[in-house]
Every structure is written in structure tokens, then in C-alpha cells.
């Protein structure tokens, strides 16, 4: 018997105050900007429409514990009436080490050549560590919501670094996500299958941070 498909929608949070200032966040914890809150409300409508269109209702919402993701998740949870909101610490953004809080120009000044040649500073979270915790989080999400008898959607509010790590693991080339950019991942019989990308807000209100 083929199990029903669990659809995971990995969503980058709304614009944060540091996104608006061009500061690399890492695991620093700035809140959403006013625009980020508007983006989250718009995204809730898009998620509802997508889930209904696929006959795959939203069964749950999971969030990183960082406030910019948690605020986004709370707005979406309230708009959709989906409770409780589940927290997952392993969904937090990549640790940016000494770059946390810096702008691109400040990084270029303090760490000349690093961005251009792919060198990372002390304290920057390695790719393998990032992927290990990302997959642990995904495993726990699947364990919580599967198996299922009918198709269902779980919305996962997280960060660019987490989504890029998962996409790379599943064979997708790097493509920068805007705030409220998202990637569908399907779970069928326990296996992960990369699906489409989407942006949950219109182009006029989209913001694409230059740095994580």
C-alpha cells in the first residue's frame, strides 16, 4: 500500500530588521520589520490557497526558535487557525560566527577577500554540521506528522541557510531565496523528494537579502 503524501513547505521568514539594514544575521535574533509582518500575512493567504488547491490541508506548523521565524510562523498560524505551533531548535539559521551583525561592506573591510574566495571566519558553522542538524529536524517533523491516511501539508518556518542545506543535499543547485521564498519537499513512504520552489508574496513586496 502506498502511503499518502506528506507535503513539507520550507519557508524563509519575513523581512527582519537586520535584513532591511543589510546585516548578516546568523543566529543573532532581530525581530521582523513592519514590512516583514505584512509579508507574513500575505503569505498565509498564499499557503491556504496552495494547500486547498492540492487537496492537502495544513496539518501543522513548525518553526525555528529564532524570533524572526517564530513571528512569521505565529502570524501564519493565527491567520490559518492552525494550532499548536511546534518549535524546532535545529531549524535555526547557520551560525555566522564573527560575521554576525556585519554588512557586506564591513565584512569586506574587516575580512578582505573572504567573500570573493569563499573563505569563512572563525565560528562559522561548517556545512556538514549544518546538514546534520537540518536532517535531524526533518526526521522529527516526519515522525510527528506521518504516517497519514490522507494528503497533508506541514509548513516549516525557517531560514535561508537551512533551506539551502536541504536543497543541496537533495541535489538542487543554489538559488537565493527571498523573504517568504519557499521550497516544497514531498515525503512518501519515508523518502524525501525535492519538488517546486515558490514565492508566497508578489514581486512588488518581495525582498531578497544579500546576506544570510
Regions found by a protein language model. Give the residues of each.
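Active-site-proximal alpha-helix that buttresses catalytic centers in soluble enzyme cores
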Residues: 2, 6-82, 110, 127-131, ...
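Acidic, low-complexity terminal tails and accessory targeting/binding regions
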Residues: 2-7, 43, 94-106, 147-150, ...
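Beta-strand elements within well-structured catalytic alpha/beta cores of enzymes
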Residues: 7-11, 62, 148-158
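Short, well-ordered beta-to-alpha junction loops that form the rim of enzyme active sites
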Residues: 14, 64-66, 90, 156-161
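Short, active-site-adjacent cap segments at secondary-structure transitions
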Residues: 17, 68-70, 93-94, 162-164
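Glycine-rich phosphate-binding loop signature in dinucleotide/nucleotide-binding domains
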Residues: 50-57, 141-152
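Phosphate-handling substructures
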Residues: 76-136, 196-197, 211-212
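A short beta-strand-loop-alpha-helix capping motif that often carries His-Thr
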Residues: 125, 153-164
Amino acid at each position: 500500500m502506498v502511503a499518502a503524501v506528506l507535503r513539507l513547505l520550507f519557508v524563509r521568514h519575513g523581512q527582519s530588521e537586520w535584513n532591511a539594514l543589510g546585516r548578516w544575521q546568523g543566529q543573532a535574533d532581530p525581530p521582523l520589520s513592519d514590512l516583514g509582518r505584512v509579508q507574513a500575512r500575505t503569505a498565509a493567504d498564499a499557503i491556504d490557497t496552495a494547500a486547498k488547491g492540492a487537496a492537502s490541508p495544513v496539518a501543522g506548523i513548525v518553526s525555528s526558535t529564532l524570533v524572526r521565524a517564530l513571528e512569521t510562523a505565529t502570524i501564519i498560524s493565527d491567520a490559518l487557525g492552525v494550532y499548536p505551533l511546534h518549535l524546532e531548535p535545529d531549524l535555526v539559521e547557520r551560525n555566522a560566527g564573527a560575521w554576525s551583525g556585519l554588512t557586506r561592506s564591513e565584512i569586506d573591510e574587516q575580512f578582505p577577500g573572504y567573500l570573493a574566495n569563499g573563505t569563512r571566519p572563525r565560528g562559522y558553522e561548517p556545512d556538514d554540521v549544518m546538514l546534520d542538524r537540518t536532517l535531524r529536524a526533518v526526521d522529527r517533523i516526519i515522525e510527528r506528522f506521518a504516517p497519514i491516511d490522507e494528503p497533508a501539508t506541514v509548513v516549516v518556518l525557517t531560514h535561508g541557510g537551512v533551506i539551502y542545506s536541504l536543497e543541496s543535499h537533495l541535489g538542487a543547485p543554489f538559488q537565493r531565496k527571498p523573504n517568504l521564498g519557499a521550497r516544497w519537499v514531498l515525503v512518501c513512504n519515508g523518502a524525501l523528494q525535492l519538488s517546486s520552489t515558490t514565492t508566497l508574496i508578489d514581486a512588488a513586496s518581495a525582498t531578497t537579502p544579500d546576506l544570510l
